[in-house]
């Protein structure tokens, strides 16, 4: 799969302004409709001077000055009024353009403070008297005005003071809108009212024509289908309109103005824009006479005479549009383009730089965390990957919000947004508006603003201010030079840090906020505001390349830390505000009705309100009825695209404590590492065109202004090898359910894993929970491939209940979430309700994502039709029928007991007759005939424990005989044993026709327990016996006298463990079994039907001279075989191996062996599965485990071996025959294998009778990394997210992703969970299927594939010492699965094995350990066993007694006691050095949770 290219940083480049092509400008100017009362015309010139005159001293107002004689409300005022000796000062000001304007005023109390830098003190009047504004006398500090002037050459468009006024608060006057009030009182004396000076800053300019902006150019020309260029972009690029202005001829061009804006789509998606506004020359020829007169170009007295010394300029803008708010990068790029257009000449056109930036600069990603773009040798910009956070990405700047408004005003605006008021934010800096408005809508997270939102509103859209709905609008402050704001709008001036509101629409008091969370928020913001005042330096200057590569991250890191702390303070407040809201959610539990999506039906409003503080009820009453809260409850109930962010907020709610008066020590918004890689991608400027040899480089492109874009000069996308495709919408995984965890869930799971790693029990349960999570990740593919999808969903539901009964600790809710979404997808709302009830019973409160999937399944799925009364009556009828059946059950059981007693009596009589007949004709060829139904069955003693062929099958009944340790051929005991076995298995009466067999071996015996076969298959434990059953028992009874030897009575009491071990300690006396090749089947023999386990047992081919059940080397039987009994034994591979489905006894076409036992190369020791699990680290990126012997890390391996018995090139007919359940097996049935050690030897090719036509089995081996469930889950989630869940059902999965596949197969088989993975192995061997649907190999015949999990290694090391349990089997002459390839040390004799077993049987484990240590000798001179002492003794005991006869828990206790006893004499360190310690508690708990693999 090709790597997807990262998305573009910029999608469009546009040019906006007045229409070009030299056409005349329309006569009508563009004036927007007034949205408020009109103000008087603004002044044409700024204030350049301010003065103070003393009326009492006879001073007059200077020429050109204006005197302030009344307050803003029209009240007459006089400074120092009524005081003797007062000078009666009056403030005057003058307008003009002869000098730079004033930009700031101040009031200075002499002696108490020093003037601010850059300010001048107005200490004298124009007539050289004192300009003190305070009354004379002691106690009154001398008060002077101070001012600051704009710098020389600031230009025509420099901001300046445009108006002054005085206010009297005692008369009820407030600060006028858009004015800034000085905090110092101009009348500080005891007499007279307080007087404050206010001033207004703005742009004072005249002779301007305003028109609506138009689109002059764009690139690319074609719209992207997923992101078309909005038509309103030009008016946002020039929000105050495209203007034509008349300037003095020598006026310098002002610095370009940078602005940002946000366009919101109908679906709520945002498009970010950045524009650079600048002026350029405009030809006079395009102006009409009327327009020229309006601009002041023609004399108003002498008609038609042009005035000299004037220049005409027009405003234009260039802009970029993107889905990413990378405003600093956009500013640098647009500034570079503007400089490029006013300089030159250049060898490359401007269009080449535009297309190069759009196509070749991607948005930073984890693979490219830092991108350094070099636009020219002197212009560079650095792009860094945003901080990974669950919070939505936006263009908000909380630092600018806090710096512009301060802590108290910021909290006041938070209250206004929460109660959905009309907010109008204005400033003279257009780039500040977007950052602050974005912060306003971001600080109410998780609530989402639902009303109109325009961070930078153009004049053409100013009528939104009169809308009757709440809104957040940002606008340029010059708008208020013409209009007053509406009465019901709250205005916020970012330049003066003031809030203007009327009495009609007044905000709630901040005291209505929750008391303690409000105090914590205010204290936190105040502290950060002080830090911001000290460290914040504003936007960075033009950055050099050296700065970008060295100090940029340090500077940005400090800003990012403060940014996240301010955002975290608001987030904590919102978490405290909504604490406990999930308790009041109302889930849907029945078929939905009208109004099911109403907030009253989804949320208990009154209950939530009563749970809050009484002082805050007024706030909550308004908040609960807002549109954004209703939308929030709907998103929590039915899910949305913001589910990851909502889940993160829920985790924040759990962390906060509203009753505390200090914030939590752990920050809610953490700064994460951007990437572990320090990779910086360097993007060079576009290449200059190649020149012919010998020619000189001549610049070709020179611009007088920003040129008109020419399509032929853009570099086409095909010419760029690294070009990025046009971005489309983000593609989700193809799978319908989304089983992916959110980033917050991954963090929580990581923390849980780290805590669980310190507690052994929790670590094992943590791994088990992740294993179940793996299965549910694969559940969508399993359900799609199932014949009955509804049944598959119910299977998953039973797995959930099994997890609950097993007290499995789940790290997240993915298991429940996947099942609920599948219920929604396949229309199973009732099952979804049952899953929700299971969650509640397990004490799990569903998070936002799970809760949304649940309600969606209940709301959108079709509920079953029918009335509840009908279902209730059917249920009652069902109960009546079941009750009647239960009453008849005792009668049926009594009849069966009587029939069994009669049959036993008849069997005993028949056995005696058969025994006499067999004694006289044991050497003759048997003749099989159909027995009568009452023919007695003979008994054979064997172990009927768990099936060695099917680890998933439950253990069957254990059938034992009496004490038969020295009995050889005990006839009555054998007969009684077979009868007891048949009674335990519930075998029916024999039926069928006699079939002559000619073979000297008996078939395999495999018991599946008491689980019935689905579908009533005749292959189960309750199937009927064939006609040959009794004849086979006759053959067994005839061999009894010939075997000879001692006989014990059948009624001898059973021996204990010590007696059984003593009985088993003579295995080496038997001679090796001779193998007799069986004759081939007659060609005319019809294929036999499927048989039960007892059918296979009772089918003789050729009567051997003695009984075929060998027990001295058995893991489960209790009697020995004589030498003669082994001499005629012919071992062949069973053709009726158990597969995944009980009752299937067909030879598997493909056998898979898996083992996780791995070798530590550091100490040459084998580490077993539970030890590997205990050594894993709680890290989803660490593949290593820790060796329990040398503590060295290493990567464990999962060994895989596949044995394929199918033909090499199967034809369609043969392929179908090989998979048929009734296909005959060449060679007939195999021998009776009542011994587990004999079962382990069936993988030898020479012992197989299940191969086709004698062909050898194809064996393929491999080893892959054995992954922790944490690591495997991360890799599987990545695979599903990138390729969809369909990849888990493709036959290419084993070859394309072998590590993931084999690890999944190992865990699923280990936990006995159904899956389609075994079928994928079979399909991958056949190759992809092109002519048929994948269902045949997704649900293969269970007999086709068999998976066996082994505890020990698959292939032994020939250079190492053999394990003791293998030596026991070698001494016992029992064929192995793999013949030991190396020599056997003489010290590891049979006597040693017998001694070890004897000590174990006598509860003297310490002696067994000491004996082994003494025999091996001290390292490094002694023998080196790859397995530890604990493992050697355990495996030897299990090989001698059988796995089901060994209580591993009791063995661990005994071994621990023996270790402590030896440690007192030898020391624990010495025992550990010689690898005699037992597994750690963590390893033992892992084995307890997962269970030991059934085979060695």
From Swiss-Prot:
Start-end of Pro residues biased regions: 1075-1090
Origin superkingdom: Eukaryota
dDENN domain: residues covered: 528-644
InterPro entries (UniProt xref): cDENN_dom (IPR001194), dDENN_dom (IPR005112), DENN_C (IPR043153), DENN_Domain_GEFs (IPR051696), MABP (IPR023341), Pentatricopeptide_rpt (IPR002885), TPR-like_helical_dom_sf (IPR011990), Tripartite_DENN (IPR037516)
Region spans: Disordered: 720-744, 891-970, 995-1055, 1067-1119, 1205-1227
Protein name: DENN domain-containing protein 4B
Organism annotation: Homo sapiens
Biological process annotations from GO: regulation of Rab protein signal transduction
Molecular function as annotated in GO: guanyl-nucleotide exchange factor activity
Segments annotated as PPR repeats: 775-811, 812-846
Feature: compositional bias, Polar residues: 913-924, 935-944
Domain called MABP: residue spans: 44-203
Annotated transmembrane regions: none
Positions of post-translational Phosphoserine modification: 953, 1092
Subcellular location(s) of the protein: Golgi apparatus
Gene of this entry: DENND4B
């Amino acid at each position: 799969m090709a790597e997807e290219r990262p998305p573009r940083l910029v999608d469009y480049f546009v040019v906006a302004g007045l229409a070009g092509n030299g056409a005349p400008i329309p006569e009508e100017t563009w004036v927007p409709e007034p949205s408020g009362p009109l103000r008087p015309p603004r002044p044409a010139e700024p204030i350049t001077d301010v003065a103070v005159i003393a009326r009492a001293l006879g001073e007059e107002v200077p020429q050109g000055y204006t005197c302030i004689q009344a307050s803003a409300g029209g009240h007459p005022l006089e400074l120092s009024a009524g005081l003797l000796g007062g000078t009666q000062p009056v403030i005057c000001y003058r307008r003009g353009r002869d000098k730079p304007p004033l930009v700031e005023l101040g009031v200075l109390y002499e002696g108490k403070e020093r003037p601010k830098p850059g300010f001048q003190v107005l200490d004298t009047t124009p007539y050289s008297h004192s300009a003190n504004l305070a009354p004379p006398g002691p106690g009154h500090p001398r008060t002077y005005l101070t001012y600051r002037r704009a710098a020389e050459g600031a230009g025509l468009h420099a901001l300046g003071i445009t108006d002054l006024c005085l206010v009297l608060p005692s008369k009820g006057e407030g600060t006028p809108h858009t004015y800034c009030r000085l905090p110092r009182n101009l009348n500080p004396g005891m007499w007279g009212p307080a007087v404050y000076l206010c001033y207004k800053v703005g742009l004072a300019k005249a002779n301007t024509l305003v028109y609506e902006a138009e689109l002059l150019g764009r690139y690319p020309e074609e719209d992207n289908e997923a992101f078309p260029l909005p038509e309103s972009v030009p008016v946002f690029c020039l929000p105050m309109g495209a203007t034509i202005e008349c300037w003095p001829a020598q006026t310098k061009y002002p610095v370009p103005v940078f602005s940002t804006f946000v366009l919101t789509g109908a679906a709520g998606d945002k498009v970010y824009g950045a524009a650079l506004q600048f002026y350029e020359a405009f030809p006079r020829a395009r102006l009409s006479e009327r327009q020229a007169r309006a601009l002041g170009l023609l004399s108003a007295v002498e008609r038609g005479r042009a005035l000299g010394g004037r220049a005409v300029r027009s405003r234009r803008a260039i802009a970029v549009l993107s889905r990413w708010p990378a405003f600093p990068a956009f500013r640098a790029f647009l500034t570079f383009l503007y400089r490029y257009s006013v300089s030159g000449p250049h060898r490359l056109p401007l269009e080449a730089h535009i297309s190069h930036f759009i196509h070749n600069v991607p948005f930073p990603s984890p693979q490219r965390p830092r991108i350094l773009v070099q636009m020219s040798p002197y212009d560079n910009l650095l792009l860094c990957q945003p901080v990974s956070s669950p919070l939505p990405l936006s263009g908000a700047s909380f630092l600018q919000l806090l710096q512009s408004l301060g802590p108290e005003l910021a909290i006041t605006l938070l209250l206004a947004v929460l109660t959905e008021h009309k907010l109008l934010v204005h400033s003279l800096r257009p780039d500040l508006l977007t950052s602050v408005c974005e912060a306003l809508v971001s600080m109410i997270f998780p609530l989402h603003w639902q009303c109109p939102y325009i961070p930078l509103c153009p004049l053409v859209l100013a009528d939104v201010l009169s809308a009757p709905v709440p809104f957040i609008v940002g606008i340029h402050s010059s708008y208020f030079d013409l209009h007053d704001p509406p009465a019901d709008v709250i205005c916020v001036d970012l330049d003066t840090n003031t809030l203007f509101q009327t009495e009609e629409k007044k905000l709630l008091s901040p005291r209505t906020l929750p008391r303690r969370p409000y105090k914590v928020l205010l204290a936190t913001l105040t502290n950060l505001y002080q830090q911001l005042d000290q460290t914040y330096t504003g936007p960075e200057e033009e950055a050099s390349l050296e700065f970008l590569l060295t100090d940029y991250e340090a500077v940005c890191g400090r800003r990012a830390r403060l940014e996240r702390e301010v955002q975290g303070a608001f987030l904590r407040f919102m978490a405290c505000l909504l604490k406990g809201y999930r308790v009041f959610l109302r889930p849907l539990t029945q078929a939905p009705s009208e109004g099911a999506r109403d907030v009253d039906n989804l949320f208990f409003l009154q209950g939530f309100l009563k749970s809050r503080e009484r002082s805050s009820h007024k706030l909550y009453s308004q908040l609960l009825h807002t549109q954004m809260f209703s939308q929030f409850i709907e998103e929590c109930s039915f899910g949305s695209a913001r589910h990851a962010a909502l889940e993160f907020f829920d985790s924040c709610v759990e962390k906060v404590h509203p009753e505390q008066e200090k914030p939590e020590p752990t920050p809610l918004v953490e700064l994460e590492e951007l990437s572990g890689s320090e990779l910086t991608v360097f993007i060079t400027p576009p290449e200059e065109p190649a020149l012919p040899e010998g020619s000189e480089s001549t610049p070709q492109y020179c611009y007088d202004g920003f040129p008109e874009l020419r399509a032929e000069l853009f570099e086409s996308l095909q010419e760029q090898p690294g070009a990025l495709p046009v971005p489309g919408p983000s593609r989700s995984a193809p799978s319908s359910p989304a089983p992916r965890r959110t980033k917050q869930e991954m963090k929580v799971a990581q923390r849980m894993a780290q805590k669980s790693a310190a507690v052994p029990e929790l670590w094992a349960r943590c791994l088990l929970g992740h294993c179940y999570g793996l299965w549910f990740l694969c559940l969508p593919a399993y359900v799609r491939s199932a014949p009955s999808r509804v049944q598959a969903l119910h299977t998953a539901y039973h797995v959930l209940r099994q997890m609950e009964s097993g007290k499995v600790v789940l790290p997240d809710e993915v298991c429940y979430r996947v099942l609920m979404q599948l219920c929604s997808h396949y229309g199973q709302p009732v099952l979804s309700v049952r899953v929700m009830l299971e969650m509640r019973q397990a004490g799990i409160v569903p998070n936002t994502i799970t809760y949304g999937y649940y309600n969606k399944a209940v709301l959108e799925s079709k509920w079953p039709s029918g009335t509840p009364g009908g279902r209730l009556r059917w249920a009652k009828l069902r109960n009546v029928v079941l009750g009647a059946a239960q009453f008849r059950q005792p009668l049926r059981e009594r009849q069966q007991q009587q029939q069994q007693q009669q049959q036993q009596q008849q069997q005993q009589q028949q056995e005696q007759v058969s025994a006499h007949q067999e004694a006289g004709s044991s050497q003759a060829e048997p003749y099989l005939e159909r027995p009568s139904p009452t023919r007695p069955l003979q008994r054979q003693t064997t172990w009927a424990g768990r099936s060695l062929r099917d680890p998933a099958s439950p253990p069957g009944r254990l059938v034992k005989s009496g004490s038969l340790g020295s009995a050889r051929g005990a006839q009555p005991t054998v007969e009684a044993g077979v009868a007891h076995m048949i009674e335990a298995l519930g075998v029916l009466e024999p039926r069928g026709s006699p079939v002559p067999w000619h073979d000297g071996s008996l078939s395999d015996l495999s018991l599946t327990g008491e689980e019935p076969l689905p579908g009533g298959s005749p292959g189960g434990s309750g199937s009927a016996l064939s006609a040959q059953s009794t004849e086979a028992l006759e053959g067994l009874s005839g061999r009894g006298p010939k075997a000879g030897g001692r006989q014990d009575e059948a009624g001898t009491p059973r021996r204990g463990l010590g007696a059984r071990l003593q009985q088993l300690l003579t295995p080496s006396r038997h001679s090796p079994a001779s193998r007799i090749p069986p004759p081939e089947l007659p060609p005319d023999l019809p294929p036999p039907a499927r048989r039960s386990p007892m059918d296979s047992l009772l089918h003789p081919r050729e009567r051997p001279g003695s009984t075929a059940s060998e027990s001295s080397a058995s893991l489960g039987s209790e009697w020995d075989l004589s030498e003669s009994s082994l001499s005629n034994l012919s071992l062949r591979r069973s053709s009726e191996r158990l597969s995944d489905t009980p009752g299937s006894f067909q030879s598997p076409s493909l056998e898979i062996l898996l083992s996780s036992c791995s070798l530590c190369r550091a100490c040459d020791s084998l580490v077993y599965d539970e030890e590997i699990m205990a050594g894993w680290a709680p890290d989803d990126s660490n593949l290593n485990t820790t060796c329990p012997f040398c503590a060295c890390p290493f990567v464990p391996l999962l060994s895989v071996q596949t044995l394929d018995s199918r033909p090499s090139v199967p034809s369609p007919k043969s392929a179908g025959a090989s998979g048929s359940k009734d296909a005959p097996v060449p060679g007939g049935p195999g021998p009776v294998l009542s011994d587990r050690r004999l079962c382990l030897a069936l993988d030898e090719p020479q012992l197989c009778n299940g191969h086709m036509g004698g062909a050898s089995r194809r064996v393929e081996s491999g080893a892959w990394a054995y992954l922790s469930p944490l690591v495997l889950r991360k890799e599987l989630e990545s695979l599903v997210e990138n390729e969809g869940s369909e990849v888990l059902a493709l036959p290419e999965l084993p070859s394309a992703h072998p590590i993931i596949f084999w690890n999944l197969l190992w865990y699923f088989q280990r936990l006995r969970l159904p899956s389609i993975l075994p079928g994928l192995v079979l399909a991958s061997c056949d190759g992809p299927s092109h002519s048929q649907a994948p269902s045949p190999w997704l649900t293969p015949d269970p007999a086709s594939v068999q998976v066996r999990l082994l505890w020990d290694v698959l292939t032994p090391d020939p250079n190492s010492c053999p394990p003791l349990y293998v030596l026991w089997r070698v001494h016992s002459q029992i064929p192995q699965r793999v013949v030991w390839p190396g020599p056997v040390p003489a010290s590891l004799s049979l006597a040693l094995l017998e001694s070890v077993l004897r000590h174990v049987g006598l509860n003297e484990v310490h002696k067994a350990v000491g004996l082994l240590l003494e025999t091996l000798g001290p390292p490094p001179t002694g023998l080196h066993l790859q397995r530890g002492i604990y493992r050697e003794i355990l495996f030897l005991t299990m090989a001698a007694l059988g796995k089901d006869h060994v209580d591993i828990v009791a063995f661990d206790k005994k071994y621990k006691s023996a270790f402590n006893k030896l440690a007192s004499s030898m020391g624990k360190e010495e025992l550990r050095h010689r690898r005699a310690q037992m597994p750690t508690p963590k390893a033992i708990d892992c084995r307890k949770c997962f269970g030991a693999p059934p085979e060695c």
